[in-house]
């Protein structure tokens, strides 16, 4: 394992995080808040330690293979979360270190579950940092490093990209990893800016528009008011719902569109299944909740917003869905598990994995009836490699195992069945809100320290697609090979 290069990457992570904190520093000073000093101090120390690591551990061989690439990515996310929580904790705005760490992990992993009971009690700088965590974590800091550091951007470091990119397959839309990373961040920044403009046109306050744009782009879901998105107009809610849906699309689709390869972009099967799930879920829920709202338009508006929010794992809410019929809540839980498209900023199991498992199951049934037939699983007209199918199956088993163990530990808190189940589902899928005590108007403050630690693990595991984080606990991974 190239430990020297891992330390070098961690150093750059600290530098990037230290620089990112200065956005919160500037915000605090604009509003005349002394909390900016915490961001200034922690950010400066982070950057200093990062520079030291980069200078001392400059690698001779800038190549990471799969094991080291996964380890570097997992350690980067843990380190980012650890350093990122200090302003919350040192300022006293979140007095408990575990709570501050939980909130930061929730931000970076774009989960959006919170331990805060009064969001509006936070200073402007803290709110900005909380939302910007989503934007940093949405596309991923490792992808950012691949874009800005030439020595890391070679095709040989594809394992860094694979470790941080959501989904079973990392496409090769462009030949050079650095170019690919730069294109991803260019599209990411462009869509974020476009949403910000639409929100400003709708007369949303600039501070709110920045925070909501960051949270939507990262599909995170942190808001700046206790009322959440419900405090804004129908126009603003619709803009947010549309952009949540757009950020749940595989960014390779946007790359193909920009390259004017429209036929190739719109032939992607996962895209149409994703849209199909949104349309079907919206229609089913709207019909089911029609009697709760004064008009069909209101029912469709509420349904589309929440479906867009949950399938993309953003987690914004307009109302307390605990009051919705059981059928609607069941649909919500199903799309919580499905999640967004692979290669998007969304979380969940991913639409592509659902398609692959469905096709593999159909193939096995076909073989039972026609044993001599030779069939291969195909996606978009291309045969799927056996290793991808094997990885998808292993992912499912590991996912179920982590989910079951987490659910078992949370049951020790004596909270109700629905709350425990949906809390684990919402955190491992990086969605944020669940049902019961952790619904859209609830929070995670009542859980024990042990349960919060388990949920922190779930958030990190879910965002990193399980394997990179689990690798850290394998002793053989740290032995020389």
Task: Give the positions of each predicted feature.
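Membrane-proximal intracellular helices of multi-pass ion channels
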Residues: 1-481
